């Protein structure tokens, strides 16, 4: 294609993107079409990948086509396995795309569609995609080392130890809650349970087919997996309608918890090519396929966003959660813009699969862009609902009341009309008894998704079908995070125990694999069990910490990335990682202060404790007081640990930049790849 024509095409993309963003940002008092959000996202991501990621790849990271990756040099058939870049992309996307991009934007929609949309677009292109890309490349150049090992080697022993304690604690909590979401989504749902269960033997079949039967035949394996998944989804509907079959797949929460714990252990212990990679690749079919279908549904339906650009709740008095746009919108929407958990995957399983350095761009930067588009779709799904419906679903009973008429009247008085009859009709349409007080974001996303699909594919008669498909989709979306997160946690435990007894640190020694897998699964499994059995909250009480914890992880990752960029002699490019780091520090530290010390009991943990102390001395109140104090303690400890890492990092930067310390990176020796003569992929 001639250079002038390419220039004109990209200029048109840029102008179209500016027009879309301007339309989103400047319209006040009138509704806009959801297509503008899709256009703005597509143009922003296209420009970001084409120009910004290319700049980072060439100038900051200097990707080398001749350098062998650890997947090639350390290949062992278990953890280090050279893998097709699209399979790696699928695994990475499936691993990073968890509850965040689905739930966060739905909850943040209480501010209106504008704040969340702008944060998702800017945060992803300049923050999240950059973090995933650079951490992945730096781990690849260090034999697939974990984030904690890189922190120890590049920042210092103290920073590395603190990073380890902070990260492993957050991983355990994150995995427990991810598992709890899956349990809540699948309990008493034979369709979802059947479909999710069938993805396991399908993944095993794909892994064996690609490894033993038809090595390298990715397209054949993809077609096989896609057909089988579609059959599993169709079979799930049949299973739910057959009393004899549904009996075996209608499971209680404790039963599901046990099964998920067993599955988590197996996923961590078996070779990555047998279950983890093919299952994540398989899940990516459903994830990307559903998101693409949702995008097509939006294009076909061209729905109107009924939620205004900004609502009255920007003042912090929102019913879904309390707090102003800054900092709470940026904490609530984590994974869709930037997520510290991604850095764990980028320095965990993924760098052990990448075949070429140049593939880190599409895997690291590209997969995060895909996840960010998921967040845009979630925003649309929430905002196409009538605001009254949205707030009826997402507002807790303690705010709007438990009786349908009371809740409807309260929400209508806010200026968002809704009636009890409308909510009853909607609940019947999706096959639920009630949709009031279905907090957490996931039910609202499912209702919005069913609304779009039923208006563009199949009509109103299949609304319930699409709603339950969305519930299954959310469970599948989240379960892959459990797979990869458990494996990352296992690697971290092996790193630590290797200092106690060297064989325990060997990722290829099977007794070490089994014992460390059992330890990490037991840790998050304990909290999962508490959450399932404890009606007063259990692990649910830690939900307010997740947004803060996730962004604190990103802060640690960007500290490591900035340190390495400086030591590479690329200090002039340090704003690439330093600017998002400074922003995250301002957001997370401000949010943490408010969550601990804010005098509003709906925001501050300690203020809520004081309020409960004035109430009746019941066991429920005593448990809630304990949970609030625990939340405040955990928040304070995490902030202090991250502050120490920031201090250690800053001191290291100053030593290197002033010449008091020689700049030396801890990269593995250069080895020429055997793929050097192949055409660059």
Residue ranges and their predicted role:
Residues 22-28, 33, 79-142, 153-157, ...:
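Membrane-interface helix-loop-helix modules in multi-pass membrane proteins
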Residues 154-172, 364-376, 439-441, 460-470, ...:
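Loop-to-transmembrane helix boundary motifs in multi-pass membrane proteins
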Residues 298-314, 369-447, 484, 529-534:
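Extracellular/periplasmic helix-exit of transmembrane alpha-helices
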Residues 53-81, 107, 121, 130-159, ...:
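Flexible loop linkers connecting adjacent transmembrane helices
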Residues 1-14, 47-102, 284, 323-328:
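Membrane-interface "cap" regions at the ends of multi-pass membrane proteins
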Residues 18-31, 102, 114, 172-188, ...:
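Transmembrane helix-loop junctions in multi-pass membrane proteins
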Residues 35-42, 47-60, 166, 190-233, ...:
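Membrane-interface loop-to-helix entry segments
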Residues 31-50, 108-138, 148, 191-199, ...:
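Extracellular loop-to-transmembrane helix junctions
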